[in-house]
UniProtKB/Swiss-Prot annotation:
UniProt name for this protein: GTPase Era
Membrane topology: Peripheral membrane protein
UniProt-recorded Gene Ontology molecular function terms: GTP binding; GTPase activity; ribosomal small subunit binding; small ribosomal subunit rRNA binding
Assembly description: Monomer.
Any single biological process term in GO: ribosomal small subunit assembly
Record has Cell membrane as a keyword: yes
KH type-2 domain location: 212-296
Gene: era
Chain segments carrying region G2: 55-59
Amino acid sequence: MTEQINQLSLSSIPIAPEGFKSGFVGIIGRPNVGKSTLMNQLVGQKIAITSPVSQTTRNRLRGILTTEEAQIIFVDTPGIHKPHHQLGKILVQNAEAAINAVDIILVVVDSSIEAGGGDRYIVELLENTETPVILGLNKSDQQPQNYQPIDESYLVLAQAHNWPVIKFSALTGEGLDNLQKTLINLLEPGPYYYPPDLVTDQPERFIMGELIREQILQQTRQEIPHSVAIVIEKVEETPTLTRVFAAINVERDSQKGIIIGKKGAMLKAIGTAAREQMQKLITGEVYLQLFVKVEPQWRQSSLRLSEFGYQIET
């Protein structure tokens, strides 16, 4: 992998100059409002998978933006929603825990539609927080001509708490310079937490697994994406070749059949696309071999959830 996502080397963390600022920014919001796309844009590299399917993000991801004057660690959280299984409960608990573990909270909403019950629920969660909050109106590029009533539905929520409001498009990058400046202004003086050239603290295997899961999200539909867990079982590396062996875990035989596809066509397509994404991050050639396993009701099993890397984060 590139230097940015190699394991953290404490010796490469410099001493911050006088006046340098740093801190953690929690990105929260309903599912599918563009939180992961936003973080990818802010750090300048794809570290969080994106998909039109809601609840794409399952873990609290950290993305790191370092400028001459500040280091901002963005924490991308799972979308806050009403959970329907044990996995969902863990995701929501982790997202809510992030609210109490950051220096600034960035609430991201979809400004192509009016505020709804999910947005108001998040505002209620933040009712008594002492952490600075910014309301970010994302998807400004997708707003209809008569967008004023939509904006007003969110401005009412922000004005009740004196939250600053910033409008932007995570997809096009419009307005993100203003967002970055606002965040830096709110940060306190602080040290470098990570080397300046690092963009995420996630290990290589996690990134590999997420790239595979992203292709499943993009190439399958309905219940399949939420029933999938990826386990990187083995990685073999030489100077010119990285061999990755990964298991795709599903809950039912029918789901296994869909992922494999007719004569293995779907599995091949998933593997080819995921390998191409890995190739952008890894020096040398990449060989990716995928297996599909059935683990009945793994989303309801505390043991399986832990084995697959899903647990309450502190």
